[in-house]
Protein backbone atom coordinates (compact mmCIF):
# COMPACT_ATOMS: atom_id res chain seq x y z
CA UNK A 1 0.00 0.00 0.00
CA UNK A 2 2.83 2.37 0.76
CA UNK A 3 4.32 1.69 -2.66
CA UNK A 4 1.01 2.48 -4.37
CA UNK A 5 0.62 5.72 -2.39
CA UNK A 6 4.17 6.81 -3.27
CA UNK A 7 3.54 6.03 -6.94
CA UNK A 8 0.27 7.98 -6.96
CA UNK A 9 1.95 10.97 -5.31
CA UNK A 10 4.80 10.89 -7.83
CA UNK A 11 2.31 10.63 -10.72
CA UNK A 12 0.35 13.62 -9.42
CA UNK A 13 3.54 15.69 -9.13
CA UNK A 14 4.58 14.83 -12.68
CA UNK A 15 1.13 15.70 -14.00
CA UNK A 16 1.12 19.07 -12.26
CA UNK A 17 4.61 19.78 -13.59
CA UNK A 18 3.50 19.01 -17.13
CA UNK A 19 0.54 21.32 -16.76
CA UNK A 20 2.69 24.15 -15.44
CA UNK A 21 5.32 23.93 -18.20
CA UNK A 22 4.42 25.90 -21.37
CA UNK A 23 4.17 24.22 -24.71
CA UNK A 24 7.13 25.38 -26.82
CA UNK A 25 5.59 24.40 -30.10
CA UNK A 26 2.44 26.43 -29.47
CA UNK A 27 4.46 29.43 -28.30
CA UNK A 28 6.58 29.25 -31.44
CA UNK A 29 3.47 29.11 -33.60
CA UNK A 30 2.12 32.22 -31.89
CA UNK A 31 5.39 34.05 -32.58
CA UNK A 32 5.21 33.04 -36.25
CA UNK A 33 1.65 34.30 -36.51
CA UNK A 34 2.67 37.62 -34.97
CA UNK A 35 5.56 37.93 -37.43
CA UNK A 36 3.24 37.21 -40.36
CA UNK A 37 0.75 39.78 -39.11
CA UNK A 38 3.52 42.36 -38.77
CA UNK A 39 4.83 41.66 -42.27
CA UNK A 40 1.33 41.90 -43.76
CA UNK A 41 0.74 45.18 -41.93
CA UNK A 42 4.06 46.56 -43.15
CA UNK A 43 3.27 45.56 -46.74
CA UNK A 44 -0.14 47.23 -46.52
CA UNK A 45 1.45 50.41 -45.16
CA UNK A 46 4.05 50.44 -47.93
CA UNK A 47 1.35 49.91 -50.57
CA UNK A 48 -0.82 52.70 -49.18
CA UNK A 49 2.18 55.02 -48.98
CA UNK A 50 3.16 54.24 -52.58
CA UNK A 51 -0.39 54.83 -53.83
CA UNK A 52 -0.58 58.10 -51.89
CA UNK A 53 2.71 59.26 -53.36
CA UNK A 54 1.66 58.44 -56.93
CA UNK A 55 -1.74 60.09 -56.48
CA UNK A 56 -0.10 63.17 -55.00
CA UNK A 57 2.20 63.47 -58.00
CA UNK A 58 5.32 64.08 -55.90
CA UNK A 59 6.88 60.91 -57.24
CA UNK A 60 6.36 58.97 -60.44
CA UNK A 61 7.00 55.24 -60.72
CA UNK A 62 7.67 55.41 -64.48
CA UNK A 63 10.12 58.31 -64.35
CA UNK A 64 7.90 60.71 -66.32
CA UNK A 65 8.86 64.38 -65.77
CA UNK A 66 6.65 66.47 -63.56
CA UNK A 67 5.69 69.05 -66.23
CA UNK A 68 4.04 66.40 -68.44
CA UNK A 69 1.08 66.04 -66.11
CA UNK A 70 -1.86 68.12 -67.31
CA UNK A 71 -3.77 68.17 -64.05
CA UNK A 72 -1.91 70.31 -61.52
CA UNK A 73 -3.06 71.97 -58.35
CA UNK A 74 -2.84 75.70 -57.72
CA UNK A 75 -0.03 75.17 -55.22
CA UNK A 76 2.04 73.27 -57.79
CA UNK A 77 1.52 75.99 -60.40
CA UNK A 78 2.56 78.69 -57.93
CA UNK A 79 5.72 76.71 -57.10
CA UNK A 80 6.51 76.49 -60.81
CA UNK A 81 6.30 80.28 -61.09
CA UNK A 82 9.44 80.62 -58.95
CA UNK A 83 11.65 78.67 -61.36
CA UNK A 84 9.89 79.34 -64.70
CA UNK A 85 8.70 82.96 -64.97
CA UNK A 86 6.52 84.03 -67.94
CA UNK A 87 7.71 86.05 -70.93
CA UNK A 88 6.22 89.30 -69.59
CA UNK A 89 8.76 90.93 -67.22
CA UNK A 90 7.94 91.55 -63.58
CA UNK A 91 8.32 95.33 -64.00
CA UNK A 92 5.64 95.40 -66.69
CA UNK A 93 3.36 93.25 -64.54
CA UNK A 94 3.80 95.56 -61.54
CA UNK A 95 3.14 98.66 -63.64
CA UNK A 96 -0.14 97.48 -65.14
CA UNK A 97 -1.39 95.89 -61.92
CA UNK A 98 -0.67 99.09 -60.00
CA UNK A 99 -2.27 101.15 -62.75
CA UNK A 100 -5.47 99.11 -62.43
CA UNK A 101 -5.48 99.20 -58.62
CA UNK A 102 -4.48 95.59 -58.02
CA UNK A 103 -1.97 95.28 -55.16
CA UNK A 104 -0.50 91.85 -54.38
CA UNK A 105 2.63 91.15 -52.36
CA UNK A 106 3.13 87.61 -53.65
CA UNK A 107 5.24 87.61 -56.82
CA UNK A 108 3.94 84.17 -57.81
CA UNK A 109 0.37 85.44 -58.11
CA UNK A 110 1.55 88.30 -60.33
CA UNK A 111 3.41 85.89 -62.57
CA UNK A 112 0.36 83.65 -62.74
CA UNK A 113 -1.72 86.59 -64.00
CA UNK A 114 1.03 87.38 -66.51
CA UNK A 115 0.96 83.77 -67.70
CA UNK A 116 -2.81 83.98 -68.26
CA UNK A 117 -2.31 87.22 -70.21
CA UNK A 118 0.41 85.58 -72.28
CA UNK A 119 -1.91 82.69 -73.13
CA UNK A 120 -4.68 85.12 -74.13
CA UNK A 121 -2.38 87.12 -76.43
CA UNK A 122 -1.01 83.91 -77.95
CA UNK A 123 -4.52 82.66 -78.77
CA UNK A 124 -5.43 85.98 -80.40
CA UNK A 125 -2.23 85.93 -82.49
CA UNK A 126 -2.95 82.39 -83.68
CA UNK A 127 -6.52 83.30 -84.65
CA UNK A 128 -5.33 86.44 -86.47
CA UNK A 129 -2.77 84.36 -88.37
CA UNK A 130 -5.51 81.96 -89.48
CA UNK A 131 -7.64 84.87 -90.70
CA UNK A 132 -4.61 86.21 -92.59
CA UNK A 133 -4.12 82.85 -94.30
CA UNK A 134 -7.78 82.78 -95.29
CA UNK A 135 -7.51 86.29 -96.69
CA UNK A 136 -4.36 85.39 -98.65
CA UNK A 137 -5.98 82.30 -100.15
CA UNK A 138 -9.00 84.37 -101.21
CA UNK A 139 -6.70 86.93 -102.87
CA UNK A 140 -4.87 84.18 -104.77
CA UNK A 141 -8.13 82.66 -105.95
CA UNK A 142 -9.31 86.05 -107.19
CA UNK A 143 -6.04 86.52 -109.09
CA UNK A 144 -6.48 83.16 -110.78
CA UNK A 145 -10.06 83.98 -111.74
CA UNK A 146 -10.38 84.58 -115.49
CA UNK A 147 -13.20 87.10 -115.14
CA UNK A 148 -11.19 89.25 -112.76
CA UNK A 149 -8.19 89.17 -115.09
CA UNK A 150 -10.37 90.12 -118.08
CA UNK A 151 -11.74 93.03 -116.10
CA UNK A 152 -8.20 94.20 -115.34
CA UNK A 153 -7.22 93.95 -119.02
CA UNK A 154 -10.24 96.00 -120.01
CA UNK A 155 -9.29 98.66 -117.52
CA UNK A 156 -5.71 98.58 -118.85
CA UNK A 157 -6.89 99.23 -122.38
CA UNK A 158 -8.86 102.22 -121.23
CA UNK A 159 -6.07 103.57 -119.01
CA UNK A 160 -2.71 102.12 -120.11
CA UNK A 161 -0.56 104.24 -117.77
CA UNK A 162 -2.53 103.35 -114.70
CA UNK A 163 -2.48 99.68 -115.70
CA UNK A 164 1.31 99.64 -115.96
CA UNK A 165 1.69 101.22 -112.54
CA UNK A 166 -0.83 98.83 -111.02
CA UNK A 167 0.97 95.84 -112.55
CA UNK A 168 4.27 96.96 -111.04
CA UNK A 169 2.65 97.45 -107.65
CA UNK A 170 0.99 94.06 -107.93
CA UNK A 171 4.31 92.38 -108.71
CA UNK A 172 5.96 94.09 -105.76
CA UNK A 173 3.11 93.05 -103.50
CA UNK A 174 3.41 89.46 -104.69
CA UNK A 175 7.12 89.44 -103.88
CA UNK A 176 6.60 90.87 -100.41
CA UNK A 177 3.65 88.65 -99.56
CA UNK A 178 5.50 85.56 -100.75
CA UNK A 179 8.37 86.27 -98.34
CA UNK A 180 6.43 87.34 -95.24
CA UNK A 181 3.01 87.20 -93.65
CA UNK A 182 1.25 90.51 -93.04
CA UNK A 183 -1.30 90.77 -90.23
CA UNK A 184 -3.73 93.63 -90.72
CA UNK A 185 -6.08 95.33 -88.32
CA UNK A 186 -8.98 93.59 -90.02
CA UNK A 187 -7.43 90.21 -89.17
CA UNK A 188 -6.96 91.29 -85.56
CA UNK A 189 -10.51 92.65 -85.28
CA UNK A 190 -11.91 89.40 -86.65
CA UNK A 191 -9.86 87.43 -84.12
CA UNK A 192 -10.85 89.43 -81.04
CA UNK A 193 -14.49 89.52 -82.17
CA UNK A 194 -14.68 85.86 -81.11
CA UNK A 195 -13.92 86.98 -77.54
CA UNK A 196 -16.59 89.67 -77.55
CA UNK A 197 -14.25 92.62 -78.27
CA UNK A 198 -15.01 95.14 -81.00
CA UNK A 199 -11.94 97.11 -82.13
CA UNK A 200 -13.23 97.98 -85.58
CA UNK A 201 -14.02 101.46 -86.73
CA UNK A 202 -17.46 102.72 -85.73
CA UNK A 203 -20.14 102.80 -88.37
CA UNK A 204 -20.46 106.58 -88.36
CA UNK A 205 -16.89 106.92 -89.71
CA UNK A 206 -17.79 105.08 -92.91
Swiss-Prot record:
Primary site of residence: nucleus
Composition bias, Acidic residues: 1-15, 30-40
Histone-fold domain residues: 47-194
The protein's name: SAGA complex/transcription factor TFIID complex subunit TAF10
Protein species of origin: Saccharomyces cerevisiae (strain ATCC 204508 / S288c) (Baker's yeast)
GO biological process: chromatin organization; positive regulation of transcription by RNA polymerase II; regulation of transcription by RNA polymerase II; RNA polymerase II preinitiation complex assembly; transcription by RNA polymerase II; transcription initiation at RNA polymerase II promoter
Residues annotated with Phosphoserine modification: 58, 146
Name of one Pfam family that matches: TAF10
Transmembrane segments: none
Task of the protein: Functions as a component of both the DNA-binding general transcription initiation factor complex TFIID and the transcription coactivator SAGA complex. Binding of TFIID to a promoter (with or without TATA element) is the initial step in pre-initiation complex (PIC) formation.
Comment field (misc): Present with 3400 molecules/cell in log phase SD medium.
Cellular component aspect of the GO annotation: nucleus; SAGA complex; SLIK (SAGA-like) complex; transcription factor TFIID complex
Assembly mode: Component of the 1.8 MDa SAGA (Spt-Ada-Gcn5 acetyltransferase) complex, which is composed of 19 subunits TRA1, SPT7, TAF5, NGG1/ADA3, SGF73, SPT20/ADA5, SPT8, TAF12, TAF6, HFI1/ADA1, UBP8, GCN5, ADA2, SPT3, SGF29, TAF10, TAF9, SGF11 and SUS1.
UniProt keyword Transferase present: no
Top-rank taxon, per record: Eukaryota
Domain notes: The histone-fold domain (HFD) mediates heterodimerization with TFIID-specific components TAF47 and TAF65 as well as SAGA-specific component SPT7.
Family note: Belongs to the TAF10 family.
Gene behind the chain: TAF10
InterPro entries (UniProt xref): TAF10
Subcellular compartments: Nucleus
Keyword terms: Nucleus, Phosphoprotein, Transcription, Transcription regulation
GO molecular function, one term: molecular adaptor activity
Keyword Repressor set for record: no
